[in-house]
């Protein structure tokens, strides 16, 4: 069976993301056209008319699962229960994909060359203010080089799904899932890219970074003995680097305060453009 005819499911959890879906769902429809793929949108305690947005997208024909209670792990589990194919992708609701993406990513899974695949992530700083734009440039360069950037759009074959197992209720679900797969069975496809938007304000950046810090600490606490974080050397314009490092420092006390008040997983609104 060729990669273009491999059946697969694309699970997209979303909570009140109608604005983002108006941009990303048509792109997903185009990327799925002519493939063996099916989109499964799990609407997670959604009240903003997202289902209507999805049903109005020409050619998408999604399976829509609506959940009354929030929780990303439960949303992902609902998507897994609705899936019927051995090859499965997980796509963030604000990520833009292009035609040919899924065929390229399905190939190593179908051929048994990998159990977990990911596309390279391209970061758009369009619409960001000057300082957040500087931070976004450094972040984008990091994501373009990191060997552990299994996020935004990931794909699993049958063995990968078994090795990963059911989703836990953790903040850093992407990192947890990646760590369940042996490094030799992971593959980032350097010539396949997806696009995401960088946070547009300094406050958004601090919120995003604080959530990442909480997620990393939670994994170390719940799963001791896991692999150490991968460090990718910083590079870029000195002013860009200064802005990036300032945001990192500012996020540390914010993350501690959030932990003190019991903050858990939440939708990252900073990268969900509304216009």
Regions from the PLM with identified roles:
Residues 26-36:
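Short, acidic, metal-binding catalytic loop of nucleotide-sugar glycosyltransferases
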Residues 99-128:
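Conserved donor NDP-sugar-binding/catalytic core segment of glycosyltransferases
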Residues 7-9, 38, 176:
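Cell-envelope/extracellular polymer assembly enzymes that use nucleotide-activated donors
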Residues 198-199, 211-275:
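Terminal low-complexity segments of carbohydrate-biosynthetic enzymes
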Residues 37-41, 51-82:
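Conserved donor nucleotide-binding strand/loop of the catalytic core
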Residues 109, 123-126, 133, 168-226:
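Catalytic donor/gating beta->alpha subdomain of glycosyltransferases that bind UDP-sugars
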Residues 17, 27, 43-52, 69:
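A conserved acidic beta->alpha catalytic loop
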Residues 88:
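Short aromatic/hydrophobic "clamp" motif used to bind/position activated sugar donors
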């Amino acid at each position: 069976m060729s990669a273009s005819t491999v059946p697969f499911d694309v699970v997209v959890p979303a909570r009140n993301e109608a604005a983002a879906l108006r941009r990303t769902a048509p792109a997903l429809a185009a990327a799925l056209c002519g493939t063996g793929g099916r989109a499964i949108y799990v609407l997670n305690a959604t009240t903003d008319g997202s289902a209507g947005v999805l049903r109005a997208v020409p050619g998408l024909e999604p399976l829509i699962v609506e959940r009354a209670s929030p929780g990303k792990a439960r949303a992902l589990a609902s998507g897994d229960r609705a899936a019927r194919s051995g090859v499965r992708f997980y796509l963030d609701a604000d990520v833009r994909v292009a035609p040919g993406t899924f065929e390229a990513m399905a190939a190593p899974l179908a051929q048994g060359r990998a159990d977990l695949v990911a596309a390279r992530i391209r970061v758009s700083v369009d619409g960001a203010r000057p300082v957040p734009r500087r931070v976004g440039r450094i972040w984008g360069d990091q994501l373009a080089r990191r060997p552990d950037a299994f996020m935004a759009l990931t794909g699993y074959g049958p063995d990968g799904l078994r090795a990963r197992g059911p989703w836990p209720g953790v903040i850093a679900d992407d990192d947890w899932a990646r760590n369940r797969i042996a490094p030799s069975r992971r593959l980032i496809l350097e010539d396949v890219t997806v696009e995401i938007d960088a946070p547009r304000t300094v406050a958004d950046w601090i919120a995003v970074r604080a959530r990442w810090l909480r997620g990393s600490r939670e994994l170390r606490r719940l799963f001791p003995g896991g692999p150490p974080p991968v460090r990718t050397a910083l590079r870029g314009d000195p002013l860009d680097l200064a802005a990036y490092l300032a945001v990192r420092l500012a996020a540390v006390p914010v993350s501690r305060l959030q932990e003190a008040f019991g903050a858990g997983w939440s939708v990252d609104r900073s990268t969900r453009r509304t216009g």
